[in-house]
């Protein structure tokens, strides 16, 4: 039975897109309060939807969150509003694109004190591509430093709308929120009434429940889903029974039926986390749809790093923890690997540095894992002399120089929005990081948008932090992948007493190799503790040593018991000590502390 049109016409599915820290989670709190989904007394913390400790601490949204609200309009009609709260950081744009596919409208939130930022523009383009109705909202209008007129002009230049269409709110104080609710009803289109078609539902998120297995969050695009239906997942053709379906209103609320236009959840005893692929389409097993929903792209990791347990007995625990994390995080990719220095571990693929930090912190907090992380790398393409192409995501897999014809590395196109005063500083940073400057657009008299192309390897380290510090916090950035280009890259090895430490190897541009080698040896000298024998730290390209530092041995004063006496007696004791140290050096292994692996990340400090 197709659902009646009036019901579908009363549904509004929308999301909030904004740059990090522009107040979207606070605005979501006000909407929840206005629709009586929660009252103030239940809000034990600000940002109700950011329920991970990490999200609150860092002040960012990491996971997509869906919540259903009931709202009675000024005209007295009842509406169902489904809000999908999305992340705003560079690394999490895949979460945004999936959430957008489940909506018809988007609130574009811009901070009245900051103006349009790089991530705002990136997410806005994603929303326009998805064909969403955009409602621009200027937030924080009650702050003394707000510049509402200036920001309104930026938004008009960006999406070419009338000034009257821009709403002004203060999410914290609740100003302008009632008008915003009415605008959502009036301007966001209702979902298409496709209840008569075969079932197609888009999975936009999933979480792991220890008792129920995978809980899948989905948006019903076509057809009807009933409790007890047999459903099939397009990606792997597996069939499950819909044990429980329902909607999310802060807590799960079971229902018998989900109809076209609804946003809800599905529990069907999915044991293996890999069966609930985010972005996949769910259909009926007995009367399936012909093709899956369009628009989902497979997520490709951009940054790779090795994660190793400090205690090698915890390898299986680490595997389990990563498996559970990867259900909640569709973009985390991992494969087992071994390292001579660190033993058994995993090579993990991440979307960016923030994503990597968050996974590490979640492993440590939620799963009590003690882990060592190696230097982040990107994926290189190596063309061999025999015509073969090898993908290298780990410096230890880099083939011998004699067998390489050329090496290609991934490049990204980046836009940086900043105050005009900092153009010089940013140009200098761009030159340091092998960036290619393209052009500059003036957004208004004070703010500019600069376009660069960078090798991805140059921005995965500390580029974001450096950009913030040279622009006194004003600059914001966003980047997208544009393909591979040939580069003159070499593998830089670190040797301790002539033995290479594979976990400290890095791939760098030839022009920077000497400088890196010198800095790295100096840094390691300060970190590796003194041994009973001398330790030589060397940086090498192939068989050529380009830099060296020596950690002198700790030595006991063997002459302390000689009060005066014959010089030959003293010499004999010193020679004996030397012999002992030489023997130690042959059998001794230098313990490399965790800080040494992190030293490469902040080599310029």
Curated annotation (Swiss-Prot):
It is found in: Cell inner membrane. GTP binds at residues 21-26, 139-142. GO terms for molecular function: GTP binding; GTPase activity; ribosome binding; translation elongation factor activity. GO terms for biological process: positive regulation of translation. Residues 9-192 form the tr-type G domain. It catalyses: GTP + H2O = GDP + phosphate + H(+). Gene3D superfamilies: 3.30.70.240, Elongation factor 4, C-terminal domain, Elongation Factor G (Translational Gtpase), domain 3, P-loop containing nucleotide triphosphate hydrolases, Translation factors. Keywords: Cell inner membrane, Cell membrane, GTP-binding, Hydrolase, Membrane, Nucleotide-binding, Protein biosynthesis. It is a peripheral membrane protein. Its EC number is 3.6.5.n1. Belongs to the TRAFAC class translation factor GTPase superfamily. Classic translation factor GTPase family. LepA subfamily. Required for accurate and efficient protein synthesis under certain stress conditions. May act as a fidelity factor of the translation reaction, by catalyzing a one-codon backward translocation of tRNAs on improperly translocated ribosomes. Back-translocation proceeds from a post-translocation (POST) complex to a pre-translocation (PRE) complex, thus giving elongation factor G a second chance to translocate the tRNAs correctly. Binds to ribosomes in a GTP-dependent manner. This is Elongation factor 4. The gene is lepA.
């Amino acid at each position: 039975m197709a659902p009646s049109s009036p019901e579908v016409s009363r549904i509004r599915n929308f999301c909030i897109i904004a740059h990090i820290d522009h107040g979207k989670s606070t605005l979501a709190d006000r909407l929840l309060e206005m629709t009586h989904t929660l009252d103030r007394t239940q809000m034990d913390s600000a940002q109700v939807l950011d329920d991970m400790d990490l999200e609150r601490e860092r002040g960012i949204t990491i996971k997509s969150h869906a919540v259903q609200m009931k709202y009675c309009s000024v005209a007295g009609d009842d509406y169902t509003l489904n809000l999908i709260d999305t992340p705003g950081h560079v690394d999490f744009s895949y979460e945004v694109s999936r959430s957008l596919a489940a909506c018809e409208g988007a609130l574009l939130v811009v901070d009245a004190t900051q103006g349009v930022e790089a991530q705002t523009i990136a997410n806005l383009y994603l929303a326009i591509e998805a064909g969403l109705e955009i409602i621009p909202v200027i937030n924080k209008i009650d702050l003394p430093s707000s510049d509402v007129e200036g920001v309104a002009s930026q938004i008009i230049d960006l999406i070419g709308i009338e000034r009257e269409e821009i709403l002004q709110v203060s999410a914290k104080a609740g100003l302008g929120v009632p008008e915003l609710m009415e605008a959502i009803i009036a301007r966001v289109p209702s979902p298409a009434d496709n209840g008569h078609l075969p079932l197609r539902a888009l999975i936009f998120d999933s979480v792991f429940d220890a008792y129920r297995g995978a809980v899948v969050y989905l948006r019903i695009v076509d057809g009807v889903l009933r409790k007890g239906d047999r459903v099939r997942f397009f990606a792997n053709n597996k069939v499950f029974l819909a044990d429980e379906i329902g909607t999310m209103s802060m807590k799960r609320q079971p229902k018998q039926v989900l109809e076209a236009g609804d946003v809800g959840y599905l529990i069907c005893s999915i044991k293996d986390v890999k069966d609930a692929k985010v972005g996949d389409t769910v259909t009926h097993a007995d009367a399936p749809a012909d093709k899956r929903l369009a628009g989902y792209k497979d997520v490709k990791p951009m940054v790779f790093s090795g994660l190793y347990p400090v205690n090698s007995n915890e390898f299986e625990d680490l595997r389990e923890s990563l498996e559970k994390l990867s259900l909640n995080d569709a973009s985390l990719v991992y494969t087992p690997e071994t390292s001579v220095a660190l033993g058994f571990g995993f090579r993990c693929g991440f979307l960016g540095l923030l994503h990597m930090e968050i996974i590490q912190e979640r492993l440590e907090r939620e799963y009590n894992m003690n882990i060592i992380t190696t230097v982040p790398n990107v994926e290189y393409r190596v063309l061999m002399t025999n015509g073969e192409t090898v993908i290298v995501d780990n410096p230890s897999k880099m083939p011998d120089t004699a067998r390489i014809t050329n090496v290609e590395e991934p490049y990204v196109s980046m836009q940086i929005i900043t105050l005009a005063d900092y153009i010089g500083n940013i140009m200098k940073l761009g030159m340091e990081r092998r960036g290619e400057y393209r052009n500059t657009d003036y957004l208004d008299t004070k703010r500019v948008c600069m376009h660069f192309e960078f090798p991805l390897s140059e921005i995965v380290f500390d580029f974001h932090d450096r950009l913030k510090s040279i622009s006194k916090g004003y600059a914001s950035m966003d980047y997208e992948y544009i393909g591979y280009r040939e580069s003159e890259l070499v593998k830089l090895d670190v040797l301790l007493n002539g033995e290479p430490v594979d976990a400290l190897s890095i791939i760098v541009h030839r022009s920077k190799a000497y400088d890196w080698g010198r800095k790295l040896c100096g840094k390691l000298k300060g970190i590796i503790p003194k041994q009973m024998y001398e330790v030589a730290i060397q940086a090498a390209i192939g068989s050529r040593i380009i830099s060296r530092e020596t950690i002198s041995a700790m030595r006991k004063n063997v002459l302390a018991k000689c009060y005066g006496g014959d010089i030959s007696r003293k010499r004999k004791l010193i020679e004996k000590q030397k012999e002992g140290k030489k023997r130690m050096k042959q059998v001794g292994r230098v313990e490399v502390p965790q800080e040494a692996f992190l030293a490469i990340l902040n080599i310029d400090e």
